[in-house]
Amino acid sequence: MLPLVALVGRPNVGKSTIFNALTRTRDALVHDQPGVTRDRNYGVCRLDEQQPFIVVDTGGIAGDEEGLAGATARQARAAAGEADLVLFVVDGREGASSLDDEILAWLRKLARPTVLVINKIDGTDEESVRSEFSRYGFSDVVALSAAHRQGIDDLLEEVGARLPEEGAGELLDNDPARVRIAFVGRPNVGKSTLVNRLLGEERMIASEVPGTTRDSIAVDLERDGRQYRLIDTAGLRRRGKVEEAVEKFSAFKTLQAIEQCQVAVLMLDATEGVTDQDATILGAILDAGRALVVAINKWDGQSDYQRAQAEDLLSRKLGFVNWAEAVRISALHGSGMRELFQAIHRAHASATHEFSTSEVNQALEIAYETNPPPSIRGHVSKLRYVHPGGANPPTFIVHGTRLKVLPESYKRYLENFFRKRFKLVGTPVRFIFREGANPYEGKKNPLSDRQIARKRRLMRHVKGK
């Protein structure tokens, strides 16, 4: 499972700014006014691709246990209780306060691994700021300015050194022969009903009440000689609808399930079409780079007209993931199950395929000769060679020159070309473009004796004029 890092501190010390810097998003609202963040906000930090982790932003602890402030403080304490590592954030400009002292006393009772993060050090004397907070007795201290992204790398290094390695938890299975499938979607789209149908038993509680499933539950299945691990997840609601603390933890567990699966099955309700929340869940799957199958549930109850309307809506709303197969199913009556598994197999095979360097270079050469990159302001990108960069999703690292001016349209052309050539379906495809450093940059080219003599003759000729 991905480890969890919690940001904790009093109001307006910059926790949300740090959250946005780590997750490379603007999901957390940032404002100078204290108390903007009230609920827990989960995201994934992938700044270090070798060690991703889930980070949770919390509301400021204001010392008031009543009303909204008290609820916010309880949310922050719950997040710290879940965390593998706590980042205790303080304000370097304002210095230590009595409220910081209270939070520190509570953190010591909690006995979680904790790193002191001094934010807003820009425009201050860093040494004097560190000296002021030295009375807290932390051996691990990171000073940064999140608003200017100064010190974020130092924070990542400190977090990486303190985090536990990913464990082979309940959802994660190291058996390479077993396919890990996560069923995700909004509440009450039929995820538990589908898993029960596949298992042939009432293993999951299925109800018409949205939010029946509160945790991610993993069960093993053998079907047609293949091994699977099915992960039934809690429905992800819009953030404004997520109220109970247990539901917030369910959302966190669902994000973990997406990160740890190999194939994500996004379930849609044919009676409701594609909603904004469906698009948000799809975004989480794409961010994780997971293979994708779209399962449209309750298809059997639709008329021909309703089906035509649903097909048109799908093509418009999900056109940007046209590489993912869409399967029409009925979890309640069992129709479409074979087609669903066939789509899962194709997506899994594409996502985990191992490419050789020779075959991808041959593909790049053909793509380059068929359609060379266009000239941009007199500059033409040169694609030298490519090599595989990993699987799930398939990643290709392209080396060349002037790649910074390579148009996005040409990058899409390469993606589509590789998809078609290698028959990749149901999986994102990533390209990483790297420019080689010029080994002669900054070096003077020494002239030979003959070149020196020629230069002198030219200079005499110029002076003679």
UniProtKB/Swiss-Prot annotation:
One of the record's GO molecular function terms: GTP binding
Q: At the top level of its lineage, which domain of life is listed? A: Bacteria
Sequence ranges assigned to domain EngA-type G in this UniProt record:
3-167, 179-352
Q: Which residues form the KH-like domain?
A: 353-437
Annotated NCBIfam families = GTPase_EngA (TIGR03594), small_GTP (TIGR00231)
Q: What the protein does? A: GTPase that plays an essential role in the late steps of ribosome biogenesis.
UniProt-listed HAMAP family: GTPase_Der (MF_00195)
Q: What is this protein called?
A: GTPase Der
Relate the assembly described in the record: Associates with the 50S ribosomal subunit.
Matches recorded under InterPro entries: AAA+_ATPase (IPR003593), G_ENGA (IPR031166), GTP-bd (IPR006073), GTPase_Der (IPR016484), KH_dom-like (IPR032859), KH_dom-like_a/b (IPR015946), P-loop_NTPase (IPR027417), Small_GTP-bd (IPR005225)
Q: Which cysteine pairs make disulfide bonds?
A: none
The record's annotation in Pfam families points to: KH_dom-like (PF14714), MMR_HSR1 (PF01926)
Key words, A-Z:
GTP-binding, Nucleotide-binding, Repeat, Ribosome biogenesis
Q: What PANTHER family does the record point to?
A: GTPASE DER
The record's listing under Gene3D superfamilies reads: 3.30.300.20, P-loop containing nucleotide triphosphate hydrolases
